[in-house]
């Protein structure tokens, strides 16, 4: 399922956050836990390193942001909220979301997990998101406005 969404929320709480408190790379677990994805694409590219796959991810508790307002607008129950700052020149590699934080808190919850990907800033040249649609065809997204995004499972 892929659905276009638009969030009317003060995004400054995310934009003004201190992203210097976390630096990491997404590849450390992907090369081990998600080999099946990369095998379909010819293997994990040797050109990806910890130096060009940096992310700075923050998690927000209910109260720091209003889970109820977010959930009402997105028509979903919000369990976790995180944001990722991706430094220039870095990429998030091909991956499958594992809903790690959700599964830690609710290991026996059988409900379908969905992800809302909301753009926090207007699109600028060089920004792009690649994803597979419901037919597993590759799509590219650009030219978005802050608050727009996608909901997918």
Regions from the PLM with identified roles:
Residues 71-151:
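Catalytic core of non-heme Fe(II) oxygenases with the double-stranded beta-helix
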């Amino acid at each position: 399922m892929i659905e276009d969404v638009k969030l009317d929320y003060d995004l400054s709480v995310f934009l003004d956050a201190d992203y210097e408190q976390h630096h990491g790379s997404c590849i450390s677990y992907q090369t081990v836990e998600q080999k099946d994805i990369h095998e379909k694409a010819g293997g994990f590219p040797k050109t990806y390193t910890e130096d060009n796959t940096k992310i700075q991810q923050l998690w927000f508790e209910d109260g720091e942001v209003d889970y109820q307002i977010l959930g009402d607008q997105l028509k979903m129950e919000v369990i976790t909220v995180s944001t990722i700052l991706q430094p220039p020149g870095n990429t998030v590699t091909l991956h499958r979301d594992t809903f790690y934080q959700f599964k830690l808190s609710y290991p026996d919850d059988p409900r379908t997990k969905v992800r809302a990907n909301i753009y926090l800033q207007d699109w600028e040249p060089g920004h792009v998101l690649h994803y597979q649609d419901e037919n597993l065809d590759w799509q590219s997204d650009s030219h978005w406005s802050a608050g727009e995004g996608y909901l997918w499972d």
